[in-house]
């Protein structure tokens, strides 16, 4: 198990745009180790997802996955998945709001509204290509993590800063994504 340091808001790397992963990289030992390290880091931090920029790697790589967890008792599980070079297209103007958190913004959360139905095209770690319609909580998770690849944090999407604060100060029982 190799857990990497998660960068925190204020680190300039988190504000940079990531570059695509090439198919030639997929078979390298370095790439395979990076994917394992990302999953190890995400699980160790008890997150639902992790983007490569959060560990200082400016590549278009996201890992997601969650199981039943006391930290997220009211959210559905998210299957483990490696997402490379994602393209997200909103399919509706309807939005869903969630209290989001982020491993790069520890101890805080904010209310963010996002399109509740998206089309996502991506490649996995084997080079297989996918084109899927995604909705609900899973769409929120994917959009949150993929934002990191464009240098965007969830705090940039807050519409009302009164709905942003420390976990231990905000009312309990709100859904949190991080």
UniProtKB/Swiss-Prot annotation:
It is an enzyme of class 3 (hydrolase). Fe cation binds at residues 102, 144, 148. GO terms for molecular function: metal ion binding; peptide deformylase activity. Its EC number is 3.5.1.88. Removes the formyl group from the N-terminal Met of newly synthesized proteins. Requires at least a dipeptide for an efficient rate of reaction. N-terminal L-methionine is a prerequisite for activity but the enzyme has broad specificity at other positions. One of its GO terms (biological process) is co-translational protein modification. Binds 1 Fe(2+) ion. It catalyses: N-terminal N-formyl-L-methionyl-[peptide] + H2O = N-terminal L-methionyl-[peptide] + formate. Keywords: Hydrolase, Iron, Metal-binding, Protein biosynthesis. Its cofactor is Fe(2+). The active site is at residue 145. It holds the Pfam family Pep_deformylase. This is Peptide deformylase. Belongs to the polypeptide deformylase family.
